[in-house]
Amino acid sequence: LTNYEPVIGIMGKTGVGKSSLCNALFAGDISPVSDVAACTREPLRFRLQVGDRYITLMDLPGVGESGARDTEYAALYREQLPRLDLVLWLIKADDRALTVDEHFYHQVIGEVYRHKVLFVISQSDKAEPTSGGGQLSTAQKQNISRKICLLHELFQPVHPVCAVSVRLQWGLKVMAERMIKCLPREATSPVVSQLHPSFRTTVVREQARSDFGETVGAVLDSISAFPLIPAPVRAVIQAVRTTVVSVARAVWDFFF
């Protein structure tokens, strides 16, 4: 359980800010992603290490930039989606060309994998009316809220849409908390250990602690359900389950 290596896909069109968002969220350094067209035929992978913990980030090409490529990308996504714990789907605040994105989401992601997608509005500081200042204006925040409503209407996502600005360091803490809640239970603790310290909030840590305990409990349930387990042993496992889960939560800090 403590050695699980999560795989997170980062999806978005060229210039959406995938690398800058990852560098802002995670404590380790991440190599810049090449925008050379040939490099997008296979997803680029980056292994991020902090201490003895690892996560893999997979750069996934955005759709809608090349009609000839979108069919190829559909096959790529269908191959990779089962291996991913989460997909961060980045959409620029000023991107209005979403018809292809909508079609791709409903036809390729579909009902099977939509729970793995977290939509993120990136570069929120570029929302109209742009000012280039040190904080978002009231008008920009209103337009971002409208964009969030639009994405909910178009995609009907499982998880709430996030909005961030790496340049202004705006929205990142909320996004980190939502990202942790979207991950499968076995992935939350390893990802939390990789987050920049400022995003390891109480909410984030307690979510990971709870998930770790529940994951331990699920392992015990699997063992007790094994057909060859003698009934007395099964009874003991079931009797101590609550205690073991509580202990796992208590020692979470030691492991992560």
Language model regions located:
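Membrane-inserting effector segments that mediate pore formation, membrane fusion
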Residues: R209-F256
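Switch II of P-loop NTPase G domains
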Residues: T40-P43, L60-V87, I91-G110
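Canonical P-loop GTPase G-domain recognition
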Residues: D125-S193
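Catalytic P-loop NTPase motifs of RecA-like helicase/translocase cores
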Residues: G64-E65, R96-A97, A127-E128, L195, ...
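N-terminal low-complexity/disordered regulatory or targeting extensions
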Residues: L1-G9, K13, V33, N143, ...
